[in-house]
Amino acid sequence: MSVSAFNRRWAAVILEALTRHGVRHICIAPGSRSTPLTLAAAENSAFIHHTHFDERGLGHLALGLAKVSKQPVAVIVTSGTAVANLYPALIEAGLTGEKLILLTADRPPELIDCGSNQAIRQPGMFASHPTHSISLPRPTQDIPARWLVSTIDHALGTLHAGGVHINCPFAEPLYGEMDDTGISWQQRLGDWWQDDKPWLREAPRRESEKQRDWFFWRQKRGVVVAGRMSAEEGKKVALWAQTLGWPLIGDVLSQTGQPLPCADLWLGNAKATSELQQAQIVVQLGSSLTGKRLLQWQASCEPEEYWIVDDIEGRLDPAHHRGRRLIANIADWLELHPAEKRQPWCVEIPRLAEQAMQAVIARRDAFGEAQLAHRISDYLPEQGQLFVGNSLVVRLIDALSQLPAGYPVYSNRGASGIDGLLSTAAGVQRASGKPTLAIVGDLSALYDLNALALLRQVSAPLVLIVVNNNGGQIFSLLPTPKSERERFYLMPQNVHFEHAAAMFELKYHRPQNWQELETTLVDAWRTPTTTVIEMVVNDTDGAQTLQQLLAQVSHL
């Protein structure tokens, strides 16, 4: 009996089972112990293969692929700390709902806890973060193939969101020519190999439940809060709120067109919050709210009912309002809860939103990161998409810009880390094939610098704008101790990215004014390559501009 041959047949069943659940993209890191999984993936024509040498970046690449494809994405890594590097992407997926299938190769049990090289305790290492965890036994013909395939089917068939960790121990030898070992074991699955459906089909019913008193509540004074949702949902939500005559407070990830722009500015005005206090119901569609003033208002508002509608399960209200947590697809929920044409009840807020936007426009000429955030809608590629980083940049765009309704916007706003942002953007571009504008800060770019290797392979123009404000300037907005702020919070690195781009043979530009930036963008959108644009700005100007605008708008 050939151990290596049966390892591969065992792995082939696992990989084929994944295809029955919509897995098309598979991300593979180099490794020896994962050889059976890697070769099985390579031999399966249903997969689109992606490779990367950095497992942390690989996990985020898979995350980006899953964001756009809306399908589960598989990841293959070898044993040891390679597995641990998938943790950040798994955590993010659990919070934002992407489906990741982590296939982690492992040493067999007799090599664990005995000093064997690259052998750690992998089963259960991700604690409660995976939706399902499977610790497979060592491949053996004593276990029928139908057990293996139905085990995979059960985990994936009941997966609504988040990650599945499948730990796969393999004994040596891992290499060798294929022989007849295990053919009869494999063939007991019969015509499943020619089919395209799971061996075990589980279809948990998830239907949106109609709120029978909706016809009562839609006649009341309401507010719509729009969090993270799809582009199509964003357009529908905007129309729904407009028909109801309810003010729509749209997050940067809502894709609603933010009909009341600069919400994080005007929510600092007492006239706005006073008017919002008249709301009898708040309907929040989507989670992951960004703006500080929005979160403060959300925490302090006290309507009679607070409803949160999101496809993700679990509690999504840190303010613990009295109301309803409705687990539903947003588009389906809107269809079940039609709007009734009513006149807008808010008078003050539309005026404040317009004045706030005019205050931002009055400052748009200076060459800075706050101004870039405001102008970002002018720089979006046609039929493209936007990927927004975390920390200060996403807050500036949320507060100062007005993105087009239905224009796709992606970000990692679950755990909101700055790790893996470039890798995620690479996955977003690969899955969509669309022109992509990505914008991150300098520390975020440094954190994921390895991912520039992924940006060498794009199918459409990708522009990466690195806003270099020399450190974590978001801490300038927080009451950090001034004497220790630079050393322990901002951590300026005093670096530029020209040589990083050159190392990966990416085009690089460092514009000095808006005209140079716009000329660079026009050229960049013409060719299916990556262009790195480093925008060097004064350290604290972005944070100071935001603070000045907040003060100005609060006194309107």
Curated annotation (Swiss-Prot):
Pathway the protein acts in: Quinol/quinone metabolism; 1,4-dihydroxy-2-naphthoate biosynthesis; 1,4-dihydroxy-2-naphthoate from chorismate: step 2/7; Quinol/quinone metabolism; menaquinone biosynthesis
HAMAP family: MenD (MF_01659)
The protein, known as: 2-succinyl-5-enolpyruvyl-6-hydroxy-3-cyclohexene-1-carboxylate synthase
Species in which this protein is naturally found: Escherichia coli O6:K15:H31 (strain 536 / UPEC)
Function: Catalyzes the thiamine diphosphate-dependent decarboxylation of 2-oxoglutarate and the subsequent addition of the resulting succinic semialdehyde-thiamine pyrophosphate anion to isochorismate to yield 2-succinyl-5-enolpyruvyl-6-hydroxy-3-cyclohexene-1-carboxylate (SEPHCHC).
Keyword Membrane recorded: no
GO molecular function, one term: thiamine pyrophosphate binding
EC category: transferase
One Pfam family linked to the record: TPP_enzyme_C
UniProt keyword annotations, A-Z: Magnesium, Manganese, Menaquinone biosynthesis, Metal-binding, Thiamine pyrophosphate, Transferase
Family, as annotated: Belongs to the TPP enzyme family. MenD subfamily.
CC cofactor: Mg(2+); Mn(2+); thiamine diphosphate
Biological processes per GO annotation: menaquinone biosynthetic process
Known catalytic reactions: isochorismate + 2-oxoglutarate + H(+) = 5-enolpyruvoyl-6-hydroxy-2-succinyl-cyclohex-3-ene-1-carboxylate + CO2
NCBIfam families for the chain: menD (TIGR00173)
Keyword Cytoplasm: no
Assembly with partners or alone: Homodimer.
Coiled coil residues, start to end: none
InterPro entries: MenaQ_synth_MenD (IPR004433), MenD_middle (IPR032264), THDP-binding (IPR029061), Thiamin_PyroP_enz_TPP-bd_dom (IPR012001), TPP_enzyme_TPP-bd (IPR011766)
Cofactor binding remark: Binds 1 thiamine pyrophosphate per subunit.
UniProt-listed Enzyme Commission number(s): 2.2.1.9
